[in-house]
Each structure stands twice: as C-alpha cells, then as structure tokens.
Amino acid sequence: MKIYRRPFKKFISMYTLKPIVVILALFLLMTIGNLKGFLVFLVIELCVLSFIVACTATQLFYVVLTENSLIVQNPAYRFWYAEFQFNTIEKIEIGYKGGLSRPYIQVMTPAKKSWRYVTDLVDERDYPDLIQTLREKGFTVETPGLHHILNKHENL
C-alpha cells in the first residue's frame, strides 16, 4: 500500500486561511472596549470562520494505492472517500486548472466519471511518482495543465 499524503498543517489552502484569521483577530481586538459589540462580533467571526474552514476542508483529499484499488480519501470528512477497483478504471485524469486552483484527480469508469477530487494533501513532489506508478499498473493517465508542477520538481 502506498499513501500519497503530506502533513495536515502543510496543505496549500492553509496559506489562505492564515491572513483571514489574523485580520478577523485584529477586528476582534478593536471591539474589546465595548462588551456588547465584542460579543456580537465574536459570534459573527465564529460563524464566518466555521464556514471558511468547512469549505476549505472539501479540498483536503489524498490518494492511497492498495494492491487492487485506488482510494481518494478526505481526512476532515472521514465519510467522504471514493474507492475504485483497478479492474473498473478506464482512465485517470490528474489535472490542474491554473491560477489559485489546486490539482485534482478524476477517475473514469465504464459506468461514469467520478467527481474531481481536489488533492490539496498530496505533495507536489509526489505527483511524478504517482503518475508513473499508475502508468506502470497499465492505466491511461492524462495530466492536463499539470506540466507546471511536474516541470517545477523535475530536477529535485
């Protein structure tokens, strides 16, 4: 079994969350003199942060390769995973839309296409190994837009 996953604290979306938390904390500190305003803003801030964290957690997927299946798992929402048996996979797409998006994986089976799972917990340095391993197992792996990431880590 091979797991393609980086530590939870190193996911790329964390860099987006840090400034938001700092800005909200500064706004909260400005309201300390007024208890009623402080409590109201605290409730609003907690609601906003809860929403942002819940949305960010939908991007936290990593990939597990077992002897006869490919598993895409989300550690934040443990119920949210997909397991694909190797004998049912027709094609795998590991792509990158560019800009502020994150790489994704999509598996095509005879029955249907899977969702595009944003693999923010897969380290960029692991993509060449993941793609090579999948191709060695005989799968067609398409990598639209991923050449930027693959070329960046080619000489490491």
Model features per residue range: what roles?
Residues 72-132, 145-155:
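Non-transmembrane, membrane-adjacent beta-strand/coil modules in membrane-associated proteins
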Residues 36-43:
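Short, aromatic-rich membrane-interface segments at the entry and exit
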Residues 43-47, 86-89:
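Short Pro/Gly-enriched beta-strand edge/turn motifs at strand-loop
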Residues 138-139:
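Helical coiled-coil signaling stalks immediately cytosolic to transmembrane anchors
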Residues 1-35, 112-115, 156:
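N-terminal membrane-targeting/pre-transmembrane regions
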Residues 50-83:
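Conserved beta-hairpin
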